[in-house]
Regions:
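N-terminal transmembrane-helix/juxtamembrane module of multi-pass inner/ER membrane proteins
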Residues: 1-69, 106-128
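Membrane-embedded catalytic cores of phosphoryl/pyrophosphoryl-handling enzymes
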Residues: 3-16, 122-208
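Aromatic-anchored segments of alpha-helical transmembrane domains
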Residues: 22-29, 94-100, 166-178
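Alpha-helical membrane-inserting segments
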Residues: 27, 33-36, 66, 96, ...
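Hydrophobic, aromatic-rich transmembrane alpha-helices
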Residues: 65-77, 144-152
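Interfacial segments of alpha-helical transmembrane regions
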Residues: 69-103
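Transmembrane helix-loop junctions in multipass membrane proteins, especially transporters and channels
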Residues: 75-79, 107-115, 178, 182, ...
Length: 208
């Protein structure tokens, strides 16, 4: 009964944040996205080094390496630390959230990315006509948000650190013109929600 009450409370809080996020995303989509994207498109000298250092392939490869290292450590030593276990699961949650976002949500919403918009594509939703190269929601922010959300749920002391890191990541997405502001906000919300939900489940599993 206590668990159900806690879950109901979490859902109510999440619903409030969902409505707030939807309002902010809608405003950004209509009023902010295009001017900001066009402004940063003119500082294209910043995009190349950012693309090289923070491409999704690089991040996914790093997370896969962490998972493999943890598995090998478990096989070699017979056990791993709680932190190591948390790190590996956070990486797995992050990768799963990224796959769902890129292959389901981006296809569903079909918003052209900033580069396509600059070259003539409209900044509109094209439902069920998207691809993994579409823009909404941001895969990078889903990737980072899911990892951060999982950690923040299990290690409350890390909340401030990850909030700062997510803000930095959001800034890099804008400066690099990878995504519109609405993409970033939606991706951060969805990713963090997925991470916190997974963290809730993992905490309940670990408490047994």
């Amino acid at each position: 009964m206590l668990i159900l009450n806690h879950f109901a409370f979490v859902i109510r809080i999440w619903s409030v944040w969902l409505v707030a996020c939807a309002v902010i995303v809608a405003f950004s989509f209509l009023r902010v996205d295009v001017p900001v994207a066009l402004y940063f498109w003119n500082v294209d000298h910043l995009r190349s080094p950012l693309n090289l250092a923070f491409g999704s392939t690089v991040i996914l490869s790093a997370e896969a390496a962490v998972i493999l290292f943890t598995v090998f450590a478990r096989l070699a030593r017979g056990h791993i630390s709680v932190f190591g276990e948390t790190l590996a699961v956070a990486c797995l949650v992050s990768m799963c959230a990224y796959v769902v976002n890129d292959h389901v949500l981006k296809v569903l919403f079909g918003v052209p990315n900033p580069a396509d918009m600059v070259h003539g594509a409209g900044h509109t939703f094209n439902f069920w006509m998207g691809s993994e190269n579409s823009s909404f929601p941001s895969g990078h922010m889903v990737l980072a948000g899911a990892f951060a959300g999982f950690f923040m749920r299990l290690y409350k002391a890390s909340i401030r650190l990850f909030c700062v890191l997510l803000l930095i990541a959001a800034g890099l997405m804008l400066v690099g013109d990878w995504h519109f502001l609405s993409d970033i906000i939606a991706g951060a919300f969805l990713g963090t929600s997925a991470g916190i939900l997974a963290g809730e489940g993992w905490a309940a599993h670990s408490a047994r």
